[in-house]
Amino acid sequence: MQVEVDLVIKMIGMIVIGALIGAVTNHLAIRMLFRPLEAKYIGKYRIPFTPGLIPKRRDELAANLGRTVVKHLLTPEGISKRLQQPIVYQAITRMIQQEVQKWTRSTKTIREIAERFVANPEGKLQQQIEQRIDQELESMAVAIKTARLTEVLGEGGTTKIKTAIPGMVEVLLHQTEQYFDSPAGKMKLEETVAQFIQSKLGGGMFGMLLANVNIVEMIQPELKRVIQGKSTHQFISEMVEQEVHTLLERTVGSLLEPEAERQIIERMKSEIVTRIPLAALLDTPLHEFLEPLEVRISQEMVPMLSKQMVNRLIEQVEQIMATLDLETIVREEVDLLDTAYLEEIVLSISRREFRAITWLGGLLGGLIGMIQAILLIV
């Protein structure tokens, strides 16, 4: 009886010892995946199996994980497929619409927004406007200077000038007639006649004789008749028309001195700049410009923009991924992870499985111990 009890105790002991050995061995094997974190030495000799498998092969793990992510998880095809889903388009549209609403209802002025990016926006904008206007006016001046005056005025302007010539001649002759009828005109005639007699006849007898005759009274009616004559009117009209025609055929550049041209440009620029209410525009709240356009921007432009953005992303997704180099990013991020933290991640995912492996080791060890005990008894 005592022998049987001893055999049972030995059998149980062998089973327990086998189970403990199996469980401890498996638990130790699992721990050796992560620990120790660094190589251990006895003197100058490294202890085998140190560091643990994962710390030892950390670089290979990071590289393989990076390749796996790029080749099998985050692929261009998968991302393109995801981008084509309506939820992505809707999310982008909604995000842009929210930004548009924020800007279209903003009470901030253009000046406040501009001052975030540039100092003294009004002065710099004024300078740029003046430079731009100056360039445009210079360009216009170059084009205009090579054109004939008749081309600049156009057919309508040229016709108006030519139509006005008869009236101008009429006014000119009328003013001339009135001038010679006036005391100043008579005095001028007397001076002219006196100078003529003095220069041509001198102080001789004939000159003294003419000096006593009122020649102006004789000339004035005749001069008036000539001025009022149709032939004079026609002659003056033809002469003016010829001069006007000659003038209209000249280029604008031939009529302007460089200094006069510069003065005209400066005056035009000054006039344009003073008419631009730049300060008032910069101090206007942003919503006053954009709020009337909010519905059109949000309902028409934003969906179109979102669609174009998604299509562009789909077209460029492979190039974007190549530029981002996701494999390198994953590898570098895994390399940066603390090994203890990496161990915690793996254990948090596989803790039950590792525990089951430990119990399985204990079970197998116990079975082996039982088989050994049976063989020992037999």
Curated annotation (Swiss-Prot):
Signal peptide feature range: none
Keyword Transmembrane helix: yes
A cellular component term, taken from the record's GO annotations: plasma membrane
Cellular compartment(s): Cell membrane
Domain of life: Bacteria
Alphabetized UniProt keyword annotations: Cell membrane, Membrane, Transmembrane, Transmembrane helix
Entry keyword Glycoprotein: no
TM regions (residue ranges): 5-25, 357-377
Major location category of this protein: membrane
Membrane protein topology class: Multi-pass membrane protein
Similarity section: Belongs to the UPF0754 family.
Name of the molecule in the record: UPF0754 membrane protein Exig_0680
Species for this entry: Exiguobacterium sibiricum (strain DSM 17290 / CCUG 55495 / CIP 109462 / JCM 13490 / 255-15)
Lineage: Bacteria, Bacillati, Bacillota, Bacilli, Bacillales
